[in-house]
Amino acid sequence: MGKRKRILITGGAGFIGSCLAEKLIEDTENFVVIVDDLSTGDTNKLPDPSKDNWRFIKCDVNNYRDIAEVMLANHFDYVFHYAAFVGVQQTQANPNKVLHDIKGIDNIFNLSKNLSVKRVFFASSSEVYGEPVDLPQNEETTPLNSRIPYAVVKNVGEAYLRSFQKEYNMDYTIFRFFNTYGPRQSIDFVMSRFIEMALNNKPITIYGSGEQKRTFCYIDDNIEATTNAFKENLYINDVVNIGSDNEISILDLAKLVIKLTSSDSKIMFLPPLPEGDMFRRFPDISKMKSLLRRDLINLEEGIKKLLADTSFIIPVEK
């Protein structure tokens, strides 16, 4: 048996981070250390405890001493920096808390550089594109138009990685996530929120007219594409949109959720959000498709998969 790859996942008790961890520990040649401060993460999302090639450490990446202790003790080969303060309402209500994540970016990337990490993977966001100036949104040609603090922080993270590559030769891959959804997502996000409301026959609330268009990427497509980039050494020092190219309006999404849940929910319109609710988000996913090498899971199928496990949306009474 060769030397195990030592992998750090920050934010690994969150939705995407925990699914990534689960996938990476399927390979016994990987040893995964998951860190999370549990401010929004949940230990119930952590992998199977009977597997011996992972461990969890409660740690705040924005606290240098906390994360330095973990990284100095483990000398990681690869780092997935997925920790972030997330959720539309939360990030808009707490802009300074969002900006605090720049400390985590600085800590993780400087420690990675100093400890000769082979490659850093960064969870960026479609938010860096801002209100679209051209569609589909392409990694190379679409200008970035970040305005809200969350988008600015992601843009800062991307700029750090490009600068560190140029100056210190530290390799990276940036994933720009577009509305990933799945069973472990919290109800701070539109898909899980709509499903929670529909399953409880509560009114489904939509900000604005509902004509805003989005694409939704099922978690399995996200994880398969991103882990293939890791395993096969693809898109090094590059940016990859992770999303879907199937657009739907928020109003039509609400109607689809009502149909698939056989709900009695009515749709209720609220005033538009003050900022950050872009009218369209539509990624060019040519690179992602080259990583996935199969058809994406369609929206209806993905929602049905999510409905098969709603334990994080509707907690089971113990």
Give the predicted meaning of each segment.
Residues 190, 249-261, 302-306:
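PAPS/PAP-binding and catalytic site of the sulfotransferase fold
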Residues 222, 226, 242, 253, ...:
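Non-catalytic, hydrophobic alpha-helical segments
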Residues 1-180, 309:
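N-terminal Rossmann-like NAD(P)+-binding domain of SDR-like oxidoreductases, especially those catalyzing
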Residues 299-318:
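Amphipathic terminal alpha-helices
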Residues 209, 237-240, 248-254, 262-280:
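C-terminal "lid/loop" region of Rossmann-like NAD(P)-dependent oxidoreductases
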Residues 62, 93, 100-103, 148, ...:
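Residue-level signal for the nucleotide or nucleotide-sugar donor/cofactor binding architecture
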Residues 156, 160, 164, 194, ...:
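Hydrophobic alpha-helix immediately C-terminal to the catalytic Tyr-X-X-X-Lys motif of short-chain
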Residues 155, 180-193, 200-202, 207, ...:
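Glycine/proline-rich active-site loop of Rossmann-fold NAD(P)-dependent oxidoreductases
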